[in-house]
């Protein structure tokens, strides 16, 4: 089995960003995507300013793809509402459109893209993967970018977590003019929902909720949430959406501290930030770009150093996002948060800035490679 120079498992933003940067650096990158074509994803409709900057550096113009500009955050808890200006311009874009643009860009700059191929297992010692048809492929380096999905042989170690993972749900609602330029965050017990306009004018609804609240099923959960969040219920016209996409076992706050030689864990395989912070896509793009640049400058042996640096870099933003998520999970914390933001709205912008993980790559001085632009 002859290895390829760089093997990337996962065709989402992290994997595609890594493939683009590797191809630009002259590294023959092979990107494996389990989806044969365009598809939706539960998370990732919000593009913060740092994600937009990273996309521009990758050669993707989100606004040209139809992304809807967002300049304000509308935070709702029960009947209470606070509206705040974001510190910089953001946008809303479906993952279907974003992922296709990134994969197309990776192919255009020279990466080999294999679509519709499901990877069943990995061998970290050999930096190899096995497809569901038994075929195997090895890489000089293996970039793990499978998002929230585990890969046998390289599954994330979640055994030391004190908190059970959360569940994510996504549905599409009819758009309305009052969502223009705004992302709405609806807070309720042990969860929250985000609502924004997509490029086609529909509204993307994403919910994060403690997994135990799903014990009675989605219909029962949504009935409870609509009672707790009447303004969200009004957005849904009092009716449950006909279709939900779901993912279970989302370990918010998790970060990997170490990796095997030649294995780069990027995106949610390296660090999982609460979606309340809106930084998931930026972290995916930034980690993919940074890891690719580190590999191009330092080879497979730089993986362990890079992973440790990314762990340190993401510690404070993810810690702050976790504090906000946990604080908003209960009625006392939500009430305090809403009062603080009403009295001192500047705190919202400051919190948004503190939960960002810069797209600028780690280890840039040691590898000598060019850094990706991003906010300081």
Where are the regions that the model predicts?
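C-terminal helical "tail/cap" subdomain of flavin- and related membrane-associated enzymes
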Residues: 293-376
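Beta1/beta-strand and adjacent pyrophosphate-binding region of the FAD-binding site
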Residues: 1-14
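Glycine-rich FAD pyrophosphate-binding loop
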Residues: 9, 20-43
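FAD/FMN-dependent oxidoreductases across multiple families
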Residues: 213-294
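A conserved beta-strand/loop capping segment in the N-terminal third of enzymes
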Residues: 52, 56-103, 124
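Redox-cofactor binding/interface segments in oxidoreductases and associated redox assembly factors
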Residues: 9, 144-145, 265
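Residue-level detector of alpha-helix initiation sites
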Residues: 12-13, 37-38, 282
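Predominantly flavin-linked oxidoreductase catalytic cores and closely associated redox partners
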Residues: 105-235
């Amino acid at each position: 089995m002859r290895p390829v120079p760089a093997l990337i498992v996962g065709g989402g933003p992290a994997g595609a960003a890594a493939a683009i940067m590797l191809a630009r650096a002259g590294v023959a990158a092979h990107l494996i995507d389990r989806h044969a074509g365009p598809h939706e994803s539960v998370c990732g409709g919000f593009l913060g300013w740092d994600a937009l900057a990273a996309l521009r550096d990758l050669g993707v113009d989100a606004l040209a793809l139809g992304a809807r500009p967002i300049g304000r955050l509308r935070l709702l808890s029960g009947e209470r509402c606070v509206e705040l200006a974001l510190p910089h311009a953001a946008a809303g874009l479906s993952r279907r459109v974003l992922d296709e643009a990134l994969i197309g860009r990776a192919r255009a700059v020279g990466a080999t893209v294999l679509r519709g191929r499901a990877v069943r297992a990995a061998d970290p010692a050999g930096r190899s993967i096995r497809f569901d048809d038994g075929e195997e492929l090895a890489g000089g380096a293996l970039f793990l970018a499978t998002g929230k999905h585990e890969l046998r042989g390289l599954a994330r170690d979640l055994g030391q977590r004190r908190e059970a993972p959360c569940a994510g749900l996504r549905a599409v609602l009819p758009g309305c003019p009052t969502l223009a330029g705004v992302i709405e965050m609806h807070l309720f017990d042990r969860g929250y929902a985000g609502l924004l306009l997509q490029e086609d004018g529909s509204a993307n609804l994403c919910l994060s909720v403690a997994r135990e609240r799903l014990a009675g099923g989605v219909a029962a959960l949504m009935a409870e949430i609509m009672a707790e969040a009447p303004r969200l219920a009004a957005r849904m016209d009092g009716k449950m959406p006909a279709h939900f996409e779901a993912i279970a076992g989302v370990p918010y706050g998790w970060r990997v501290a170490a990796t095997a030689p030649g294995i780069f864990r990027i995106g949610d395989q390296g660090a999982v930030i609460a979606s309340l912070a809106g930084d998931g896509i930026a972290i995916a793009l930034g980690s993919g770009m940074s890891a690719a640049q580190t590999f191009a400058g330092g080879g497979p042996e730089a993986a362990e150093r890079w992973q440790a640096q990314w762990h340190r870099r993401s510690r404070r933003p993810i810690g702050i996002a976790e504090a906000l998520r946990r604080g908003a999970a209960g009625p006392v914390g939500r009430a305090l948060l809403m009062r603080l933001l009403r009295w001192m709205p500047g705190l919202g912008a400051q919190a948004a800035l503190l939960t960002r993980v810069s797209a600028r790559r780690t280890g840039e001085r040691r590898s000598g490679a060019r850094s990706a632009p991003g906010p300081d």
